[in-house]
């Protein structure tokens, strides 16, 4: 097991897509002497089994910019790093059952137009041209974002990890953080199973384990909770095998679920009411 280096400018705790993305982006901002510590393998917490949706649709201007940056990055990372991300630019649909939904779509479209993310408000008849398997009963239209889609979370994380390493960052896997202490100098000492490291900054990107890491520095109420969520993947389907173009990710607010193509089958994710 590789012993950890003794000093760094910044230490990220957690090797999911959030921690690795931060590491990658800090190298792009010119930061040096960066370290990430992961207790298992990269993505081995919650990231690896995420459904990987990458929507452009949001009612927040700031999030719209983040979403657009993310999809543009996932499309370009393979050229930069040689590591495929598994991004599918199949587009997305959000179904509307009420005229109020359409009115909200116009508000959202104004935001996406402002940040440069293509978006359309389409009729029920136009939905059939994009997704032939949707029943149109009660549907009055949809919000269509043609350039987003979904990505492979593990492949995307590994591509950013390679980019971060290329930028000089160091990643230590299979090394659990056991404690974090503030030193009189104002620096932090991060204790791990394979040695200790002193740094200027610590980032808690531990996902489900964020509260535990927070308690190491006296933060008892980090606003992070786990949510129960399932998705199911069907067998291959003969009608999907006939398709020449991948189906868009579809979100149905009435069913509180999303649906997308997975290989030659479907992936369906319902949101539980009491999650």
Predicted feature descriptions by range:
Residues 15, 58, 206-207:
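Glycine-rich, N-terminal phosphate-binding loop of Rossmann-like dinucleotide-binding domains
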Residues 18, 42, 209:
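Conserved Rossmann-like nucleotide-cofactor binding loop
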Residues 143-201, 209:
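Helical element adjacent to the flavin cofactor pocket in flavoenzyme catalytic cores
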Residues 52-130, 254-259, 263-267:
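Dinucleotide-binding Rossmann-like beta1-alpha1 core, especially the glycine-rich loop
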Residues 21, 180-275:
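Flavin-dependent oxidoreductases
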Residues 4-18, 35:
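Beta1/beta-strand and adjacent pyrophosphate-binding region of the FAD-binding site
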Residues 23, 27-28, 163-165:
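Gly/Ala-rich phosphate-binding loop of Rossmann-like dinucleotide-binding domains
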Residues 27-48:
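Glycine-rich FAD pyrophosphate-binding loop
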């Amino acid at each position: 097991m590789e012993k950890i280096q003794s000093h760094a400018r910044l230490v990220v705790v957690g090797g999911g897509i959030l921690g690795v993305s931060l590491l990658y982006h800090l190298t792009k901002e010119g930061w040096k002497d960066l370290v990430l510590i992961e207790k298992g393998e990269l993505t081995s917490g919650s990231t690896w089994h995420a459904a990987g949706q990458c929507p452009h649709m949001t009612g927040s201007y700031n999030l719209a910019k983040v979403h657009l940056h993310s999809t543009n990055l996932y499309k370009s990372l393979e050229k930069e790093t040689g590591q495929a991300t598994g991004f599918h630019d199949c587009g997305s649909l959000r179904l509307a059952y009420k005229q109020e939904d359409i009115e909200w779509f116009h508000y959202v479209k104004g935001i996406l137009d402002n940040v440069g993310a293509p978006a359309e408000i389409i009729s029920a008849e136009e939905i059939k041209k994009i997704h032939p398997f949707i029943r149109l009963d009660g549907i009055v239209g949809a919000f269509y974002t043609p350039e987003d889609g979904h990505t492979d979370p593990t492949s995307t994380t590994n591509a950013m990890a390679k980019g971060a390493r290329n930028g000089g960052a160091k990643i230590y896997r299979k090394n659990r953080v056991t404690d974090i202490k503030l030193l009189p100098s104002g620096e932090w000492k991060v204790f791990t199973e394979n040695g200790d490291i002193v740094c200027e900054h610590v980032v808690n990107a531990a996902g489900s384990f964020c509260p535990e890491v927070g308690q190491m520095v006296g933060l008892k109420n980090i606003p992070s909770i786990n949510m129960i969520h399932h998705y199911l993947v069907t067998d291959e389907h003969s009608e999907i095998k006939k398709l020449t173009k991948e189906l868009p990710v579809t979100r149905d607010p009435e069913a509180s679920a999303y649906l997308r193509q997975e290989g030659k089958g479907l992936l369906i994710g319902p949101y539980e009411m009491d999650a």
